[in-house]
A protein has these predicted regions:
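N-terminal interaction/assembly modules
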Residues: 1-149
Length: 149
């Protein structure tokens, strides 16, 4: 078996778990705001944390919550048809993660950002929420990553 491919898959799986936990943490943060450090402590013992890329989880949560969300919501509003405050909290969390990755993580290909966001929205969001997430992240990727397309 190709060792580098296996290692890349394992790293990708660990990041996917980190994103899942970040969606849950950011959902909690929206419902009951508090310091991002509390989110890290709260989720440190999560059942899936041993399978997650803990550093990536922290980068997502800290990168979004540390700014208080207002800056991210202002940026997100450029790509949505309604105010971010009116979004379902799950889709809002997924979109914040996607926007963070598109803006600050050029090491993550835009297609991965969109695929992961759609998958999380399918798993945790409303019935057709994944379609909305797909459209918004696609719009954001066109503007934020024009050279990748």
């Amino acid at each position: 078996m190709n060792e580098p491919l296996t290692a890349r898959r394992a790293a990708s799986n660990r990041r996917a778990v980190a994103r899942k936990l970040a969606v849950q943490a950011l959902y909690r943060w929206q419902v009951n705001a508090g310091p991002w450090q509390d989110l890290l402590l709260e989720f440190a013992d999560a059942e899936d944390m041993p399978k997650a890329d803990r550093e990536y989880f922290e980068a997502l949560v800290r990168g979004i919550a540390e700014e208080g969300g207002a800056g991210w919501d202002r940026d997100l509003a450029r790509f949505t048809d309604r105010a971010p405050a009116e979004l379902d909290p799950v889709e809002h969390a997924v979109l914040l993660i996607g926007l963070f990755e598109l803006s600050r993580r050029p090491d993550v290909p835009y297609r991965v950002v969109i695929d992961e966001g759609v998958g999380l929205a399918r798993r945790f969001g409303a019935t057709d929420g994944h379609k909305y997430v797909n459209a918004v992240l696609d719009r954001a990727a066109r503007e934020l990553r024009p050279d990748e397309r």
